[in-house]
């Protein structure tokens, strides 16, 4: 389904045409066709979110209303598919200018990431509070942790597999200290909201967590009102420098140690872990971001390894591979621990400033050796973020499946793929 428009398709911005075009109808389909075999032990609901303007138009990719797509798997069957708008005030009372709602924390879209914590499904983006939905994709309301959360929350919190804590942060603040650290208990209570001093506001899309530390990425996509005319008030400024901030997980601003690195940008790290008195990070690093405008995605990330030596006060920066990839994940049971395998989506379209181009493969990296195994999706098939589902609660690492919704540009159809992670 695509938006109908009187304008020629090629006259629309890239995020409103082809597979990016808004889906305006909500639907529920049952007893879905299955090609191949769904493992009978794979039981649960796959849910993804993405920007999907309910009005049919938006000024920037990032501003579209959140739409959820879910597929329920059980007993070797795909029982249902459904898509639902996240019912935020932006649906019932839309604003002409999305930036006008930045001060109202209820006006989130939930269009960037979905995750579970404390038996709740959270839909997130980085400028507002999360929104809660149930397993049928019905909207339940905002999550402000009993009124204790007084700032926005990142789209990419981490759930510690050891303690069950939700670790998060917030960067969208017009006033110092420009960054806040957020820690939520396993039962959903806000236990820490800590101001972290930065020299200015930067677009900190994601961060890193280990068993004992937080690693913030102060990278030079800086607040710049002059850039607002291209969609967002942020601009890459190499002269601002780049650094990593290491803090104990229960620490405060005074405990942060900063380590300078070469200027770059990272939308998504893959994982981080401790090794002796060092912290090892694997990230999808790109040379810069938003080159000609805030709608320029010509730069793509590649897998890099950063090793922070806490004794020497240094960072070693190493490129692991030259293949472009992003949206990296590990087994959620190993977030912040020494995971061996990372799963990334290939990126295409390097140098194409007109639109982002998702690749036609998934990469599985051995993070210890840097070796990479490719899974081809097929010519003209575009991937999405790969999610690992273990075969059982006690299955070993890499014993399970990679799940994602991919799009076939040849047939203009999307499908859920389930791939044996070891095949």
Locations of regions flagged by a protein language model:
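Beta-propeller domains
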Residues: 1-423
């Amino acid at each position: 389904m695509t938006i109908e428009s009187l304008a020629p398709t090629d006259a629309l911005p890239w995020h409103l045409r082809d597979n990016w075009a808004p889906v305006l109808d909500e639907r529920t389909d049952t007893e879905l066709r299955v090609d191949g075999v769904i493992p009978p032990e794979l039981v649960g609901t796959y849910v993804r979110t993405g920007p999907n303007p309910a009005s049919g138009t938006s000024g920037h990719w990032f501003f579209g209303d959140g739409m959820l797509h879910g597929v329920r798997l059980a007993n070797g069957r795909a029982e249902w598919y459904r898509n639902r708008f996240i019912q935020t005030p932006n649906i019932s009372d839309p604003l002409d200018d999305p930036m006008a709602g930045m001060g109202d924390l209820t006006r989130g879209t939930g269009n960037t990431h979905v995750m579970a914590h404390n038996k709740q499904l959270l839909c997130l983006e980085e400028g507002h509070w999360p929104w809660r939905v149930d397993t049928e994709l019905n909207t339940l309301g905002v999550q402000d942790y009993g009124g204790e959360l007084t700032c926005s929350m990142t789209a990419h919190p981490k759930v510690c597999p050891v303690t069950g804590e939700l670790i998060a942060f917030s960067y969208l603040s017009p006033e110092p200290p420009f960054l806040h650290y957020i820690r939520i208990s396993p039962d959903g209570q806000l236990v820490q909201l800590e101001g972290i001093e930065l020299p200015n506001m930067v677009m900190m899309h994601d961060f890193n967590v280990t068993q004992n530390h937080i690693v913030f990425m102060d990278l030079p996509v800086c607040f710049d009102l002059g850039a607002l005319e291209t969609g967002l008030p942020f601009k890459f400024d190499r002269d601002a420098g780049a650094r990593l901030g290491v803090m104990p997980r229960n620490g405060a601003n005074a405990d942060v140690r900063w380590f300078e690195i070469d200027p770059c940008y990272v939308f998504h790290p893959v994982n981080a872990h401790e090794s002796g008195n060092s912290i090892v990070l694997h990230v999808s690093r790109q040379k810069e971001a938003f080159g000609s405008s805030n709608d320029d995605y010509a730069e793509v990330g590649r897998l890099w390894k950063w090793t922070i030596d806490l004794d020497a006060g240094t960072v070693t920066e190493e490129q692991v591979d030259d293949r472009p990839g992003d949206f990296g994940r590990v087994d959620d049971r190993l977030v912040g621990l020494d995971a061996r395998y990372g799963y990334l989506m290939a990126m295409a379209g390097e140098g194409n400033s007109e639109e982002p181009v998702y690749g036609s493969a998934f990469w599985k990296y051995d993070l210890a050796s840097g070796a990479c195994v490719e899974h081809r999706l097929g010519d003209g098939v575009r991937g999405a973020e790969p999610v690992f589902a273990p075969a059982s609660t006690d299955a070993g690492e890499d014993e399970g499946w990679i799940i994602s919704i991919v799009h076939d540009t040849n047939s203009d159809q999307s499908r859920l793929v389930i791939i044996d992670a070891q095949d």
